[in-house]
């Protein structure tokens, strides 16, 4: 059975339920939170049953997924209370179009088995990417205080070092900066990623530092799941703590709006892990997962 959730009341009940399952539900919780705050990306939430759902999938409306090669748009966020038994639901042809290039995002590594099994049944190849998920201490305090119990937070008080404010000016990104962001984004560098970035810049709060020429030298964006993403610094401005300052400023801006603040870092990126520690972001290992699926 497949049930699209209609109306504000159902979606608010879903958000509350997902909140009780944090951090395993974080990627879906963040997405549903923004659906309930105006739904700027025009997404839908589908469950296997209601109100006692086992699995929820959030994705764009069918009419928005017209480009079979655009996995940035063809993205599904999934949370399941029963990852071992969600394969049948995820395999419903009317739920996920496995004939498209797509990506699945989840805070649950335990979904891997179901996705790998579906790859054989539906004949697509799948590549899993796993990263460290980080939740800002203030967000953890409010949504999942138990995460802070065993964590030693940085003595910095979560604040970055000061920057040269005569040289750099705190600002927001403009849609004309999308090409620059795409060029330096690990998952970007193409026309479709640039379109996705343009949409994120137009839709959600961003943060950047403008350099002496008045153009961005360091930046941070937010995607449709509410995650801070696509941070970058021009090579000649690296190692000066600018990205720490930008991410701190962006997190403050999102926090003031009442948004949950979270991000992810590659296991090999020690500089960004150190920065996350400085800013008192709480690490949740293996909790950022993405599966890129390409039909054979």
UniProtKB/Swiss-Prot annotation:
GO terms for molecular function: glycine N-acyltransferase activity; glycine N-benzoyltransferase activity. Its EC number is 2.3.1.13, 2.3.1.71. The keyword Repeat does not apply. Its main location: mitochondrion. It catalyses: an acyl-CoA + glycine = an N-acylglycine + CoA + H(+); benzoyl-CoA + glycine = N-benzoylglycine + CoA + H(+). It is found in: Mitochondrion. PANTHER family: GLYCINE N-ACYLTRANSFERASE, L-COA N-ACYLTRANSFERASE-RELATED. Belongs to the glycine N-acyltransferase family. The keyword Acetylation applies. It comes from Pongo abelii (Sumatran orangutan). GO terms for cellular component: mitochondrion. Transmembrane segments: none annotated. GO terms for biological process: glycine metabolic process; monocarboxylic acid metabolic process; response to toxic substance. The modification N6-succinyllysine is found at residues 16, 127, 141, 169, 183, 256. The modification N6-acetyllysine is found at residues 16, 127, 141, 159, 183, 256. It comes from the Eukaryota. Keywords: Acetylation, Acyltransferase, Detoxification, Mitochondrion, Transferase. It is an enzyme of class 2 (transferase). The gene is GLYAT. This is Glycine N-acyltransferase. Mitochondrial acyltransferase which transfers an acyl group to the N-terminus of glycine and glutamine, although much less efficiently. Can conjugate a multitude of substrates to form a variety of N-acylglycines, thereby detoxify xenobiotics, such as benzoic acid or salicylic acid, and endogenous organic acids, such as isovaleric acid.
């Amino acid at each position: 059975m497949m049930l699209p959730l209609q109306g504000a009341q159902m979606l608010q009940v879903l958000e509350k339920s997902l909140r009780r399952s944090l951090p395993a539900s974080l990627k879906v919780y963040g997405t549903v939170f923004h659906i309930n705050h105006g739904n700027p990306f025009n997404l839908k939430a589908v469950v296997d049953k209601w109100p006692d759902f086992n699995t929820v999938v959030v994705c764009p409306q069918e009419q928005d997924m017209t480009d079979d090669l655009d996995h940035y748009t063809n993205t599904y966020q999934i949370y399941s209370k029963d990852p071992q038994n969600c394969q049948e639901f995820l395999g419903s042809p009317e739920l996920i179009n496995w004939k498209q290039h797509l990506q699945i995002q989840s805070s649950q590594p335990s979904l891997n088995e179901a996705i790998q099994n579906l790859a054989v049944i539906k004949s697509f190849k799948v590549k899993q990417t796993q990263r460290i998920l980080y939740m800002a201490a203030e967000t953890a305090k409010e949504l999942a205080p138990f995460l802070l119990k065993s964590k030693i937070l940085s003595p910095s008080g979560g604040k970055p070092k000061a920057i040269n404010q005569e040289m750099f000016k705190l600002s927001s990104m403009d849609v004309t900066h999308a090409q620059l962001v795409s060029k330096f984004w690990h998952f970007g560098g193409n026309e479709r990623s640039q379109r996705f970035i343009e949409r994120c810049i137009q839709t959600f709060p961003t943060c950047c530092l403008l350099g002496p020429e008045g153009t961005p030298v360091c930046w941070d964006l937010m995607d449709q799941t509410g995650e801070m993403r696509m941070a970058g610094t021009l090579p000649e401005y690296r190692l000066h703590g600018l990205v720490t300052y930008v991410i701190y400023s962006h997190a403050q801006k999102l926090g003031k709006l009442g948004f949950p603040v979270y991000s992810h870092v590659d296991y090999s990126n020690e500089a960004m892990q150190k920065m996350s520690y400085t800013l008192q972001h709480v690490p949740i290992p293996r909790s950022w997962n993405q599966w890129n699926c390409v039909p054979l």
